[in-house]
Amino acid sequence: MDQAEYFHSWCRQDEMMLNLLEKCPTQQIQRLPLPIRRLEKKQEIQKMLEARREDYHKAMEGVAREWEKLQEKEAEIRVGLEKYKKSIVKNDKKQERAFRDAAKARSMCIQYDLQLKALQEQCEELDKKRAKTKAQVQKYEKCHRYLEKVVKASEKFQSIPELMSQFHALVSYLPQEEQEEQKSQESRSQRIHCMEEKSDSIVQFSNEIHRLYIRLEKAKKKRREWELRWNQMLKTATRKNLLLGTIKAAVRDIFQTVISQGLGSNSVGEDDIVEQLEIIRKDIEDLTDIWEKLSLNEELMEPIRAPLLPTDKTLGHPPSQ
């Protein structure tokens, strides 16, 4: 039996008392005097009321405990939701920062690749210049030997100074060639050093990209775990809300039963469960006080009245009170 049926049966206790009195054996009523029968019936009714009252108090204590548990669960769920929201915001920020770092690393890699290509082009140009310079030197040496032969064979160059002036003219060009060669060597060494540095930087950035990718995967995994926890908390909250709705419906049915019998005020809102329980408790206490007063008055009146012998009209039926 659920709580609603229990309180409906409790509110119909007058009918149950009458049925109980009607089921009493006729021979036992004939043997006992009327005051004793009334006293026994009153004691039975008081026992029934005490049992009903104890059951009601136990039911109310259970409802109060469930209500406290539900409030504690609701507070825990709210705290968990706040923590979950904060963790989501924190993970989103971490993810955005990781994306920014990865984009920055990619842009730097692209920039370094462009610089490396430019240096390679410069090195190629310098190699071409060096080859051209070497070719010119070889060409001038051949020309010098050829000119000596020409001086010997030709009539145009008759003296050695003319030949030396021509030689010095050729030698004056050699320092420039050496400087260019030295610059070419320096640029080559710089290129090699720069390529080594850039390769190390590329390796470092590749490792950084890999590490950021691992962090991104961990963040995605943690986000999925929190989504699963969120779904579980939603299911728990839904189940608790259904249980709370069942309890509220039972209390509302009891309150409507009390109101329909004219034992309480109808000014309480439908959602004010605590106030409805308080009105039910007060009505039960009022009915109990009335019953005790009537019982006390009846006990005071019994010694004054003379004992009545059972008649045909009273046999099998309880006296009206």
Swiss-Prot record:
Belongs to the CFAP73 family. One of its GO terms (cellular component) is cytoskeleton. It comes from Xenopus laevis (African clawed frog). Keywords: Coiled coil. It comes from the Eukaryota. This is Coiled-coil domain-containing protein 42-like 1. Residues 36-144, 202-229 form a coiled coil.
